[in-house]
UniProtKB/Swiss-Prot annotation:
Free-text activity regulation comment from the record: Enzyme activity is enhanced by acetylation.
Active site positions, chain numbering: H200
Lineage: Eukaryota, Metazoa, Chordata, Craniata, Vertebrata
Residues bearing attached sugar chains per UniProt: S33
Keywords from the named record: Acetylation, Glycoprotein, Mitochondrion, NAD, Oxidoreductase, Phosphoprotein, Transit peptide, Tricarboxylic acid cycle
A GO biological process held by the record: gluconeogenesis
PTM annotation (N6-succinyllysine): residues: K78, K91, K185, K203, K215, K239, K269, K296, K301, K307, K314, K324, K328, K335
Modified residues (N6-malonyllysine): K239, K307, K329
Residues the record lists as Phosphoserine modifications: S246, S326
Catalytic activity: (S)-malate + NAD(+) = oxaloacetate + NADH + H(+)
Name the record gives this protein: Malate dehydrogenase, mitochondrial
Primary enzyme class: oxidoreductase
Recorded family membership: Belongs to the LDH/MDH superfamily. MDH type 1 family.
Amino acid sequence: MLSALARPVGAALRRSFSTSAQNNAKVAVLGASGGIGQPLSLLLKNSPLVSRLTLYDIAHTPGVAADLSHIETRANVKGYLGPEQLPDCLKGCDVVVIPAGVPRKPGMTRDDLFNTNATIVATLTAACAQHCPEAMICIISNPVNSTIPITAEVFKKHGVYNPNKIFGVTTLDIVRANTFVAELKGLDPARVNVPVIGGHAGKTIIPLISQCTPKVDFPQDQLATLTGRIQEAGTEVVKAKAGAGSATLSMAYAGARFVFSLVDAMNGKEGVIECSFVQSKETECTYFSTPLLLGKKGLEKNLGIGKITPFEEKMIAEAIPELKASIKKGEDFVKNMK
């Protein structure tokens, strides 16, 4: 009975994550044994888009890989343990996803993670620059507002920087905005799309409710409350987990969604749009998240901010100083590395 139930669910999951024909994407997850890494690896293993899944961490990866390898989907899974095995994990990869790092605990901001996670991201991206310089790099490790500039500076140091292939995964902000708007309006969240621009921390998270499809209207007080909830949704989860972690399952879902969109676009699917924190000329910040048209070579076209309301304009103006500081902090970290 259970197996009869499980198969349609598995098929539905696969369909929900991709509409493309089968492909042969080689994907690596760095930080695969962690709270985000394990469920993210499960979702990637479940996708017909992925033919090879290589998992890296400093502990437990052989076990995670063995467990996932028993799942009856086509992706071949292999685990790699410790720095000496990292080069083999990365060779030949098309996409590298990096959720590695320490999670937030109650009372911590994403920025409090900087010192630990900056070193981890710099080390891992240096290996990517050496062993898979052409791969798409998707950074989940917080603070994304600083870890993307770190990644870019590391790739520049190695002479292989391509701004169209480095993405800060902010998809969870869009997923949350879609969910919260759908809850308030009684809509199917799968049919709601709210662009979220800016960055990926606190007030730098700017949901453009005015651009939501389908169109929705909220009184100003409700709009302010909704915006605040989207901005602080990560903290909501950290508090609810009471010291036992941060948003891992929803982040894994959002990370998988972004990877599948990217792979679909790399396969030639047209009209694939996702928001992501990338190098940008849309504002005075050198990095900024906006809707992006994805293509075979990564970022095909930045679709920009579009028409916005005075309320949204004000949020952008207030976010820019914080974003600039976070970006500079990341860039300075790499410049000062020994």
